[in-house]
């Protein structure tokens, strides 16, 4: 495998869309086809500093509520660390990278959900400078169903506790952005897990390996 062949693949989706099982499937597929396990990341998070930022974003503090703009900027601070210190170095070494969320999450959640698209686009351009995944698989699911699934996992975090209209706006933004970028593939996550995995594998098998 050459450096040029290394790819950055991201799995996106609303809460409860099945990202974890999809990531496990893709990780195994990449390892089978390249002989090496991919570098797996999550956002926010993925470096010591970014993980501390993740806690600030995910855990509610009633004594000092996080405002929408701070949430956006913190997430981009974490992302900048991850891209600079993990993702780009791994790709430069010829390693595949598999991400649990990336910039599309901010465009959907903070841009669409929070109504901060001008800020999101400005900070994205300033921090990422056009850096994008080679492929993003967006697991599309009705937010009501997704939140029901998420609730079964246990206590919801600060983001998961947002009102349903927040997630509806985020979903609409995901779908709009997917319609404008051929590198974003929409997967129907309302199907059975076997059907979802079949669709994901079809996308992966169509890639050049």
Swiss-Prot record:
GO BP terms in the entry: dTDP biosynthetic process; dTTP biosynthetic process; dUDP biosynthetic process
**Gene Ontology annotations for the cellular component aspect, listed alphabetically:** cytosol
What EC class does the entry list? transferase
The record, for CDD domains, names: TMPK
**PROSITE patterns, per this entry?**
THYMIDYLATE_KINASE
Known EC number(s)? 2.7.4.9
What catalytic reaction does the record list?
dTMP + ATP = dTDP + ADP
- The UniProt annotation places ATP binding at 13-20
Could you tell me one molecular function GO term of this UniProt entry?
Answer: dTMP kinase activity
Supply the InterPro entries for this chain: P-loop_NTPase, Thymidylate_kin-like_dom, Thymidylate_kin_CS, Thymidylate_kinase
Give the record's keywords alphabetically: ATP-binding, Kinase, Nucleotide biosynthesis, Nucleotide-binding, Transferase
Provide the coiled-coil residue spans: none
Bilayer-crossing residues are none
Q: Which family does it belong to?
A: Belongs to the thymidylate kinase family.
- Name the UniProt record assigns to this protein: Thymidylate kinase
**Species this chain originates from:** Shewanella sp. (strain ANA-3)
Q: Which gene encodes it?
A: tmk
